[in-house]
């Protein structure tokens, strides 16, 4: 459990719908939660990391597009590195569930040590998520 990453993000609208997306569509697990009249939060086991969904009435969206290799990507975003098998399985599930892609699955850094397949989606509260798999995972931090 040491070195588990934690990220807290705002959820506008229906918190239950967003929890359902992470659990039923992405296959994550629901963790601890707390509901109060004017605030609520829920932890999601995001591939071994703590993603906390905080109910919010405020919009925090300031999205920009930045070029990375050959594709513009949305900033801000967060995501996870998956092994190739899990990535392909999730890619198929997202298509079957008719999840709209912000960026369709594509290969970047082709024929480079950083080669990866990546895709970007949004949760029901418009938080952008990147899902990727690297051909050489050990190259992630320049190893």
Model-predicted regions and their roles:
Residues 59-63, 137-140:
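A short local loop/turn or secondary-structure capping micro-motif enriched for an aromatic residue
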């Amino acid at each position: 459990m040491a070195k588990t990453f934690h990220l807290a993000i705002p959820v506008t609208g229906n918190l239950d719908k967003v929890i359902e997306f992470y659990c039923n569509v992405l296959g994550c697990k629901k963790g601890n939660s707390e509901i109060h009249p004017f605030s609520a939060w829920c932890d999601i086991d995001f591939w071994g990391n703590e993603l906390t969904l905080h109910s919010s009435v405020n919009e925090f969206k300031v999205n920009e597009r930045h070029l990375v290799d050959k594709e513009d990507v949305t900033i801000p975003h967060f995501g996870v590195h998956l092994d190739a098998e899990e990535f392909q399985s999730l890619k198929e599930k997202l298509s079957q569930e008719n999840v709209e892609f912000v960026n369709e699955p594509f290969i970047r850094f082709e024929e480079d040590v950083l080669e990866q397949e990546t895709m970007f989606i949004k949760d029901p509260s418009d938080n952008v998520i990147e899902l990727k798999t690297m051909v050489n995972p050990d190259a992630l931090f320049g190893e």
